[in-house]
From Swiss-Prot:
V region of the variable domain of T cell receptor (TR) alpha chain that participates in the antigen recognition. Alpha-beta T cell receptors are antigen specific receptors which are essential to the immune response and are present on the cell surface of T lymphocytes. Recognize peptide-major histocompatibility (MH) (pMH) complexes that are displayed by antigen presenting cells (APC), a prerequisite for efficient T cell adaptive immunity against pathogens. It holds the Pfam family V-set. GO terms for cellular component: T cell receptor complex. One of its GO terms (biological process) is response to bacterium. This is T cell receptor alpha variable 4. Its main location: membrane. It is found in: Cell membrane. The gene is TRAV4.
Length: 109
């Protein structure tokens, strides 16, 4: 039987800059699948970086990945940023139940 992992994403307003970020409220996935979470940030400044965090219940946010343009990959995730930088996509490969968390997209320098 395949387990369902729930990835919860909240709308956040970055305190690091004036760019407003918009994300989906929640999404479901089966274990072992790739999950892609898109964040819109239409009024991003030229020098702003895009940073993603993961937060588990009763814990503080944990840094996942940060990027400025194109594609960034680390051992946890990949971050895709198109040329216009008005959105970004966090890609989590092969999710499991332990990935159930709140994911935040923040924009700032």
């Amino acid at each position: 039987m395949r387990q369902v992992a729930r990835v919860i994403v909240f709308l956040t307003l970055s305190t690091l800059s004036l760019a407003k970020t918009t994300q989906p409220i929640s999404m479901d996935s089966y274990e072992g699948q790739e999950v892609n979470i898109t964040c819109s940030h239409n009024n991003i400044a030229t020098n702003d970086y895009i940073t993603w965090y993961q937060q588990f219940p009763s814990q503080g946010p944990r840094f996942i990945i940060q990027g400025y343009k194109t594609k960034v990959t680390n051992e946890v995730a990949s971050l895709f940023i198109p040329a216009d930088r008005k959105s970004s996509t966090l890609s989590l490969p092969r999710v499991s139940l332990s990935d159930t968390a709140v994911y935040y997209c923040l924009v700032g320098d």
